[in-house]
A protein has these predicted regions:
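Short, glycine/acidic-enriched loop or turn micro-motifs at the edges of active sites
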Residues: 12-14, 118, 155
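A short, structured active-site edge motif that brings together acidic residues
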Residues: 111-123
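Conserved non-catalytic scaffold segment of RNase H-like nuclease domains
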Residues: 1-111, 125-147, 173
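Acidic, divalent-metal-coordinating active-site segment for phosphoryl/phosphodiester hydrolysis
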Residues: 148-161
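Acidic two-metal-ion nuclease catalytic site recognized across multiple nuclease folds
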Residues: 161-231
Length: 231
């Protein structure tokens, strides 16, 4: 079992790291098996948080209104991580968002990691659900605030220690850190239909937007359309 690592989790506005944003990062730095430092911070998104995300996470637009922008928070988190191994539950999801966020500001985020979800899928194949909540319930691990980044990260650290206690000796390869990978896809240009619809909305709403139809991406156009429709 690793004695030093970082367990982390992010809360986001959706599932696509190229189109959605991180709104909260939670992490704990473990040294010699004990929590040595904590990282908990909101990020102010460029778009409003949907009611569905608020219902899931409890994070409201008011809670992030005074938060720092992505570039500042992500840079601080990268410094916090140092050279540590990252541990997460479905860590590829959290890593994909962190990598895209870092890349957007010209920063590199290359990490080794351990995924408690993958460990559980192999070691506990008989369990119907391998979600963090289900595994915490199975092992009686308390998670005071599920779907909030720091509390999920803390629960993940406890789950990792529990799984290592029961299964690492039987299958040590399952617990070895691997290189985390995520290939950032090149943004796709907005479709002619999106541009036409966006122009029509701008005329109807009588608003002024600073945008270039020749360079706007598909995801940016979708976000602008959503914001105009909500308004």
């Amino acid at each position: 079992m690793l004695k030093s690592y970082i367990a982390f989790d992010v809360e986001t506005t959706g599932l696509n790291p190229l189109e959605n944003e991180i709104i909260e990062i939670g992490a704990l730095k473990v040294r010699n098996g004990k929590v040595a430092e904590r990282f908990m911070e909101f990020i102010k998104p460029t778009t409003s948080i949907s009611p569905a995300i608020t219902s899931l996470t409890g994070i409201t637009n008011e809670m992030v209104a005074e938060a720092r922008p992505r570039c500042s928070v992500v840079a601080d988190f990268l410094d916090f991580c140092e050279d540590d191994v990252l541990i997460g539950h479905n860590v590829s999801f959290d890593y994909s968002f962190m990598k895209c966020s870092a890349a957007a500001d010209g920063l590199s985020f290359e990490k080794m990691g351990i995924d408690t979800l993958k460990i559980a899928q192999k070691a506990l194949s008989g369990l119907e659900s391998k979600s963090l909540g289900s595994l915490c319930e199975y092992y009686h691990i308390e998670n005071k605030s599920a779907h909030r980044a720091y509390h999920d990260a803390l629960a993940t650290a406890k789950l990792y220690q529990t799984l290592a206690h029961y299964f690492e000796e039987k299958d040590p390869k399952l617990f070895k850190p691997i290189q985390l990978t995520y290939k950032i896809k090149k943004p796709q240009p907005a479709t002619p239909k999106q541009i036409a619809f966006l122009n029509n909305l701008i005329r109807k709403k009588r608003v002024k937007l600073s945008w270039d139809p020749d360079t706007v991406t598909r995801s940016e156009a979708s976000r602008m359309i959503d914001d105009l429709l909500k308004g």
